[in-house]
């Protein structure tokens, strides 16, 4: 089908997804193939221009993603950069990730989607996305289309050469952005090594490198962040990956900011969510938001497993 016809169809898919209605299996397959063509051209350190709005974990909380767009502006009117973790834990991982990928295919210059530690075959089999795909489609094909696509997602982004965005954090194997550019990202997230660290590491109050309680990645201190930012001409590392009660949290003397965009995480944590708006001079402001009003969602009684992922 020609580009014009496909764009028309894509607009219909986006409209449908905005109503939280899933696409059928064939449509998902087509969408993922188109997305691969776009993502394969993107760098491990994808260059992004400001103004842009930077978002953290969404975790299948579709109605809260709608609230995020309400607060931050619709795509493509607002440029967005999402730092991973679209799936697992929330009840609408399928609709959430399908919508974000559809927006990426429709407006490739207006939205950037990075890989999080949950964009992985192994993690999604444990934390909900795999089971949700089985439940909603009756087989694992859609799960396979998406997890194959996840291998293509860029690992990091660089806003105007100054603000470095990624899901997790820094790595003892990586001193420069060129080290990241040289990685082969087209694979499942490894258990260890630089690619793993970028998606799993966390900032810490202690200096230097530490063993991560998550069992993957490292903890890194302010000395590490300052050295990395200085060596690479950066003003800030922006990352997600950790629940923060106000939706955003500065650390390491403002060398690092954590942004978390899933309010009342797992429908039980009681946290606010936030997004970071960067204007055309790279001035930042944070917009906080609470959960969208919900109708007819399963009442959460099961205690969510203690999480370190």
Curated annotation (Swiss-Prot):
Keywords: Centromere, Chromosome, Cytoplasm, Cytoskeleton, Hydrolase, Manganese, Metal-binding, Methylation, Nucleus, Phosphoprotein, Protein phosphatase, Ubl conjugation. Its main location: cytoplasm. Binds 2 manganese ions per subunit. PROSITE patterns: SER_THR_PHOSPHATASE (PS00125). Its cofactor is Mn(2+). Mn(2+) 2 binds at residues 85, 117, 167, 241. It comes from the Eukaryota. Belongs to the PPP phosphatase family. PP-1 subfamily. Catalytic subunit of protein phosphatase 2A (PP2A), a serine/threonine phosphatase involved in the regulation of a wide variety of enzymes, signal transduction pathways, and cellular events. PP2A can modulate the activity of phosphorylase B kinase, casein kinase 2, mitogen-stimulated S6 kinase, and MAP-2 kinase. Part of the striatin-interacting phosphatase and kinase (STRIPAK) complexes. STRIPAK complexes have critical roles in protein (de)phosphorylation and are regulators of multiple signaling pathways including Hippo, MAPK, nuclear receptor and cytoskeleton remodeling. This is Serine/threonine-protein phosphatase 2A catalytic subunit beta isoform. It comes from Oryctolagus cuniculus (Rabbit).
């Amino acid at each position: 089908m020609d580009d014009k016809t496909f764009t028309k169809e894509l607009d219909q898919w986006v409209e449908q997804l905005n109503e939280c209605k899933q696409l059928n299996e064939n449509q998902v397959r087509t969408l993922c193939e188109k997305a691969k063509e776009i993502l394969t051209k993107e760098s491990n350190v994808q260059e992004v221009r400001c103004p842009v709005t930077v978002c953290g974990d969404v975790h299948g909380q579709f109605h809260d993603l709608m609230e995020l767009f309400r607060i931050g502006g619709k795509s493509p009117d607002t440029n967005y950069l999402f730092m991973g973790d679209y799936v697992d834990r929330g009840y609408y991982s399928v609709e959430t990730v399908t919508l974000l990928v559809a927006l990426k295919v429709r407006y490739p210059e207006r939205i950037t989607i990075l890989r999080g530690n949950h964009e992985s075959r192994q993690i999604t089999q444990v934390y909900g996305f795999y089971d949700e795909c089985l439940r909603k489609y009756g087989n694992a094909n859609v799960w396979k289309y998406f997890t194959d696509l996840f291998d293509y997602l860029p690992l990091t982004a660089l806003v105007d050469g100054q603000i470095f965005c990624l899901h997790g954090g820094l790595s003892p194997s990586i001193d420069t952005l060129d080290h990241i550019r040289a990685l082969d990202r087209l694979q499942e997230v490894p258990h260890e090594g630089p690619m793993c660290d970028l998606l799993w590491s966390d900032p810490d109050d202690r200096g230097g490198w530490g063993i991560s309680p998550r069992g993957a990645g490292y903890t890194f201190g302010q000395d590490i962040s300052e050295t990395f930012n200085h060596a690479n001409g950066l003003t800030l590392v922006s990352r997600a990956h950790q629940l923060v009660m106000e939706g955003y949290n500065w650390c390491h003397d403002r060398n690092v900011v954590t942004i978390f965009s899933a309010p009342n995480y797992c429908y039980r944590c009681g946290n606010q969510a936030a997004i970071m708006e960067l204007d055309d001079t790279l001035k930042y402001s944070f917009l906080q938001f609470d959960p969208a009003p919900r109708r007819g969602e399963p009442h959460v009684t099961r205690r969510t497993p203690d999480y370190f992922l």
